[in-house]
Amino acid sequence: MASRLGKMPIWQRYFVIGSIFLCSITGLMYLLVNDFHLTPLIFRPHTILSWHGLTAMAASMALGSVLTVHLKAGLKAKQQMVSGLGQLVCLLALILTAALLYYGPAELREHAITAHWVIGILFLGFFLGHMLHISCKQKALS
């Protein structure tokens, strides 16, 4: 169990970090292979996209697990507001643009693709910043 309010249990921390990193990596791989036409080393674009979809489902579950305690505690403590809320806004926008990619009108598809990968890269920056701040803070305390 967590030692302080808002700190995630170790299993949850690994689940959140793992699912978000896998989702980010597969998203970047798909972007490089499909949009920038880099030759895939092992996987074809459809396989990468399938893995991205599966890891996005896990990342959405991770988001749900964080909302109940971690986010609430962070808001109350007013710590890491920019990186935390930045991640939340980006994730909600990523879910919206993903829905537009699959269910939206064809004329919005290209805009949704561009928005999805730009927001995805922005999200990864917020996520890494959030993680690095926590890591530096933990090292300073020990």
What is each residue range found by the language model?
Residues 1-142:
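Membrane-embedded alpha-helical bundles that constitute the cytochrome b-like, heme-associated redox core
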